[in-house]
């Protein structure tokens, strides 16, 4: 019953209706939402009247210090981790029945395609020792990594770059990952369903090209300047001020 603003963090907006989340707005008297999903995607699943702010959190700077030098990392394979589906017909038919909000294929279509390539090393979210705060240690083992989500950008995009990986990231009109501010060929390599094999093979066929290390370093610098928890905290403070000093 305290008269204080209620700020709510949100991740998967597309399950708002299937999980009955919208009524929570009135129940908990939520004033504002924040998260890393693009604003248009949030309002596609929540009423336009709900206030939302994009804040990119997840990279804790101290976990990305003392990086393994790029030259000493694995370069024969490209790392891809996290949830993924399968491409066989039976799996895809079963997946369709889940609906868009819970469809692995809808969320991870390109990631699923990437892991079928022979030079991509794939590990699921928990099938390794490098979980939670140790995830950066897994990333630091590899020169390159893949960050792909077909509906919106996820934390992997800025975790991978923070770890000094040359990051192949899915950036399309649909997933609106351009909101992160990365630039293709400068601090990341943009991929999509049409060009991913070509882009990934360009690295595998010439892994010692100095341009890769330069792009990786640029990606790390951009992330540590714009996409860390320190920056996110400042953004949250500014959001709080809007309500405290109104």
Regions found by a protein language model. Give the residues of each.
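Residue-level signal for the nucleotide or nucleotide-sugar donor/cofactor binding architecture
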Residues: 155, 191-194, 227
């Amino acid at each position: 019953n305290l008269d204080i603003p209620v700020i709510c963090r949100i991740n998967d907006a597309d399950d708002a209706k299937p999980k009955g989340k919208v009524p929570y707005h009135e129940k908990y008297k939520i004033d504002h939402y924040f998260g890393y999903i693009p604003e248009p995607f949030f309002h596609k699943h929540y009423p336009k009247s709900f206030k939302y702010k994009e804040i990119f959190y997840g990279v804790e700077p101290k976990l990305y210090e003392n990086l393994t030098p790029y030259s000493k990392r694995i370069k024969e394979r490209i790392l891809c981790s996290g949830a993924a589906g399968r491409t066989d017909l039976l799996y895809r038919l079963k997946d369709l029945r889940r609906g868009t909000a819970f469809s692995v294929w809808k969320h991870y279509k390109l990631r699923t395609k990437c892991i079928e390539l022979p030079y991509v090393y794939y590990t699921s979210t928990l099938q390794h020792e490098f979980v939670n705060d140790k995830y950066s240690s897994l990333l630091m083992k590899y020169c390159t990594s893949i960050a792909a989500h077909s509906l919106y950008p996820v934390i992997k995009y800025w975790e991978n770059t923070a770890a000094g990986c040359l990051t192949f990231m899915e950036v399309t009109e649909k997933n609106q990952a351009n909101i992160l501010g990365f630039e293709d060929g400068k601090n990341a390599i943009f991929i999509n369903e049409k060009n991913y094999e070509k882009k990934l093979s360009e690295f595998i066929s010439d892994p010692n090209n100095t341009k890769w290390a330069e792009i990786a370093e640029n990606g790390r610098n951009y992330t540590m300047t714009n996409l860390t928890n320190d920056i996110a905290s400042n953004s949250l403070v500014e959001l709080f001020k809007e309500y405290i000093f109104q």
